[in-house]
């Protein structure tokens, strides 16, 4: 499948166009995209769009890109964040092409001189292209800039939230906590479970049920356990039982749980 995606297509230029929606301003098909970058994000998005009926052209980021926006309705820069600005600067601007990046923490300024700019950050983990392409269908996306980014979300059956430029970094920090920090906490679960002689798999259903409760009730109402009950004697025993290297994270998260419990109690009293 990746080999098929890797074949360079004309992105709607010099080919017999398939049936599709038409942009009234440019009279071009809006179901074609060129993606610069063959990492997990670029290949996942390319595969997902191709399966939704789009024509997709994948380009390596080290390839000549000056003409990348020529004859292309949507140009996606799917490179690592630190090089997005330099790649965008190397592309000649085209008023008929929308240039988009996939970075969560960067604003539209990273796309420099291009007249039509947008950002499209998928709120989903993309471990590899096959799984990633499936997860993109129906996913949440943080968007900003040109309305054309909404057409990508629509094509994937996703949902979008517009994030203002001044809030991009805070938004991305929340995404990191939700995904990366959660994984780090589960790494601690695995270590402590091993110390107790219990397989990590035994805790996975608990994690799933907890996430389901948060989704249904919200974090405050979903909190259970010793902190929610005010049972600080049990918390102290936990800290005594843990290896020294595990205590700091446990203590920090117990304090965060205390804040959550206090907020939930205040809300219940109001």
Q: Which role fits each region the language model picked out?
A:
Residues 201-270:
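NAD(P)-dependent Rossmann-like dehydrogenase/reductase catalytic/cofactor-binding core
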Residues 45-47, 52, 129-216:
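Internal alpha-helical scaffold of NAD(P)-dependent oxidoreductase catalytic cores
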Residues 2, 8-70:
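NAD(P)+-binding Rossmann beta1-loop-alpha1 motif at the extreme N-terminus of oxidoreductases
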Residues 43-47, 62-132:
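Rossmann-like NAD(P)(H) cofactor-binding subdomain of soluble oxidoreductases
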Residues 58, 101, 118-119, 142-143, ...:
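Structural signal for conserved beta-strand scaffold positions within catalytic alpha/beta enzyme cores
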Residues 33, 55-57, 117, 160, ...:
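Hydrophobic anchor at the start of a short beta-strand
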Residues 33-35, 77, 143:
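Hydrophobic Val/Ile/Leu positions in short beta-strands of Rossmann-like dinucleotide-binding domains
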């Amino acid at each position: 499948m990746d080999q098929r995606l890797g074949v360079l297509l004309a992105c709607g230029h010099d080919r017999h166009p398939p049936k599709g929606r038409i942009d009234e301003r440019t009279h071009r098909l809006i179901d074609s995209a060129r993606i610069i970058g063959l990492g997990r994000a670029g290949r996942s998005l390319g595969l997902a769009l191709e399966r939704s009926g789009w024509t997709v052209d994948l380009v390596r980021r080290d390839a000549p890109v000056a003409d990348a926006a020529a004859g292309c309705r949507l140009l996606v820069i799917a490179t690592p964040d630190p090089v997005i600005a330099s790649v965008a600067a190397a592309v000649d601007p085209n008023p008929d092409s929308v240039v988009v990046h996939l970075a969560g923490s960067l604003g539209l300024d990273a796309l420099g001189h291009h007249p039509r700019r947008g950002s499209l950050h998928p709120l989903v983990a993309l471990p590899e292209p096959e799984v990633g392409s499936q997860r993109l269908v129906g996913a949440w996306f943080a968007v900003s800039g040109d309305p054309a980014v909404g057409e990508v979300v629509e094509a994937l059956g996703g949902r979008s939230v517009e994030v203002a430029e001044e809030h991009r970094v805070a938004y991305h920090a929340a995404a990191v906590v939700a995904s990366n920090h959660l994984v780090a906490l589960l790494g601690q679960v695995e270590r402590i479970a091993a110390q107790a002689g219990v397989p990590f798999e035994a805790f996975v259903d608990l994690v799933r049920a907890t996430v389901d409760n948060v989704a249904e009730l919200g974090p405050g109402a979903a909190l259970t356990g010793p902190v929610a009950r005010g049972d600080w004697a049990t918390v102290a025993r936990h800290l005594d039982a843990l290896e020294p290297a595990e205590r700091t994270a446990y203590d920090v998260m117990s304090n965060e749980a205390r804040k959550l419990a206090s907020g939930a109690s205040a809300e219940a009293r109001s």
